[in-house]
Regions:
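A non-catalytic alpha/beta surface segment that caps or lines the substrate-entry region
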Residues: 43-111
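Conserved aromatic anchor
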Residues: 367-379
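Extracellular fibronectin type III
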Residues: 433-462
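N-terminal capping segment at the start of a domain
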Residues: 19-65, 311, 319-320, 324
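Alpha-helical metal-binding/catalytic segments enriched in His/Glu/Asp
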Residues: 108, 122, 127-128, 132-181, ...
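Metal-dependent peptidase/peptidase-like ectodomains
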Residues: 174-287, 295, 299
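Beta-strand-rich modules
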Residues: 416-440
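Active-site-adjacent mobile loop/cap segments within catalytic or ligand-binding domains
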Residues: 49, 207-225, 276-354
């Protein structure tokens, strides 16, 4: 078996011989993003608000008011896209659920044509609340929290449902978030039971306002939160990360880097910068992506650049001249459209790209570094990445190494030696590249860097 290690050349096309290029991956996903309809999203949020309250403990049988009516409407809207649609439910009780209550998520699946078990999931929570998390009778419009994320999920399904992708996309409206992230846990457990290879969970929670409660406005950026050292397997991973690195290289952190780079590469219509926030979530707050992390899946949270706390978890009221409550008139639908466009571009790209490989880097007491990885089924091209240990993002080197199998299939293990590059000074990673140019997120060659649930190695025999 032969494989070639190449250096990417800097190529210049002669103007005299130039021909119109075929659309590249950036052009294709940008065109998908352009289909996002701001007016349609506003109508979606208006409909969600019309249910009065979507509190998890509200009526499940009333046809016009409560969580049950909202879930049934969402299910009908998903079915209109032609996708396989169903509810995943489980009973729950807890600190904010005093009696056992049925918690349901509405799920729509767009099955992949080549790799149906490789899955990217977009989520938003459909339930809402007021000041008292146990009050399920007052109106809780939940326009931004999280009608905005729910609208993004539905709009993504409307835009992408008629396209075909190698991998699978799952669209989900989750319940029970405000009562304790129950909907996220239910879907993460379902994904585990189905043995999905979840490449990414893109959780959208509060993505529809651009001005904060202090008057500061920022409509040019979206925050993406990602965990550092991965939670799963931390007891086994901790000493290995301490020795070999990986504090900043969880799959979720690399998913965040991927999203930031994607926003740059795609450009208009995605006119937002990704502000990478390197912690799992905001101080003292939580979101459904955490339950995907607990299950071992890469997950990030999208949320606005500046939050307005007067409009979150508040009874509708006017107090001391200040208006409180999460109503639709406080939203910025132009901003929501931009965040949704980034999500659509990311879903299309991730469902088109192969999953990242699992890699390791070695080079102790050597002036060279050896990077080894297991090839992904059906993928013959891989890119080696490096960055300084104190650098934020992977270096965009023009001479980055590319490994391509010259015969099919690739051997069970691929390896390349980076001459004169000392392992101590760098973090290394590997990405997979499809035949049509879609590159996966980078998987860091560190303990816990693989895009899969972590399994501790067996104990060493003395």
């Amino acid at each position: 078996m032969r494989f070639a290690v190449l250096l990417l050349p800097l190529m210049l096309a002669s103007p005299a011989l130039a021909v119109p290029p075929l659309p590249g991956p950036e052009d294709i996903v940008a065109e998908h993003a352009r289909q996002v309809d701001s007016a349609r999203m506003k109508r979606t949020v208006q409909k969600l608000v019309s249910f009065g309250t979507r509190h998890t403990l509200s009526s499940q049988t009333d046809k016009r008011r409560g969580i049950g009516a909202a879930l049934k409407w969402m299910e009908r809207e998903f079915k209109r896209t032609g996708l396989e649609t169903f509810q995943v439910c489980d009973g729950a009780t807890g600190r904010r659920i005093p009696v056992t209550t049925l918690i349901c998520d509405v799920v729509a699946i767009q099955h992949g044509t080549e790799r149906p078990n490789d899955v990217v999931i977009i989520t938003g929570h459909i339930d809402s609340r007021v000041s008292d998390p146990m009050d399920f009778t007052r109106d809780a419009p939940g326009a931004n929290d999280d009608g905005s994320g729910t609208a993004a999920v539905l709009e993504a399904a409307r835009v992408l449902a008629k396209r075909k992708f190698p991998g699978t996309i799952v669209y989900a409206a989750l319940s029970g978030e405000e009562q304790g992230l129950y909907g996220g846990k239910i879907l993460a457990e379902y994904a585990t039971t189905q043995k999905w290879n979840v490449v990414a969970n893109l959780n959208n929670d509060i993505i529809g306002n651009s001005c904060g409660s202090d008057g500061v406005c920022d409509a040019k950026a979206v925050r993406v939160f990602s965990e550092g050292p991965r939670w799963q397997g931390r007891e086994d991973l901790a000493p290995r990360i301490r020795s070999l690195g990986g504090e900043n290289d969880s799959p979720s952190r690399n998913l965040s880097r991927f999203l930031a780079r994607l926003a740059e590469r795609v450009g208009p219509p995605v006119n937002l910068d990704v502000r990478q926030i390197w912690r799992n979530d905001r101080f003292g707050r939580g979101g459904d992506h955490t339950e995907f992390l607990n299950a071992g899946f890469p997950a990030v949270r999208f949320t606005v650049a500046v939050e307005n706390y007067n409009y979150q978890h508040q009874d509708l009221r006017l107090e001391n001249g200040i208006e409180y409550g999460d109503t639709i008139d406080k939203m910025d639908f132009g901003y929501l459209t931009g965040v949704t466009q980034l999500n659509v571009a990311a879903l299309a790209w991730l469902a088109s790209a192969p999953p990242p490989p699992e890699a390791i880097a070695e080079g102790a007491v050597s002036t060279d570094t050896t990077v080894t990885w297991k090839p992904v089924a059906g993928v013959n091209s891989y890119r080696i990445h490096k960055r300084r240990t104190d650098s934020t993002n992977w270096a965009p080197d023009p001479d980055v190494a590319v490994v391509t199998c010259e015969d099919k299939p690739c051997p069970p293990e691929l390896k390349t030696v980076l001459k004169g590059i000392r392992v101590d000074d760098w973090v290394f990673g590997v990405s997979s590249v499809s035949k049509d140019g879609y590159e996966s997120p980078v998987a860091s060659a560190v303990p816990g860097g693989a895009f899969k649930p972590y399994v501790a190695p067996p104990p060493t025999t003395p």
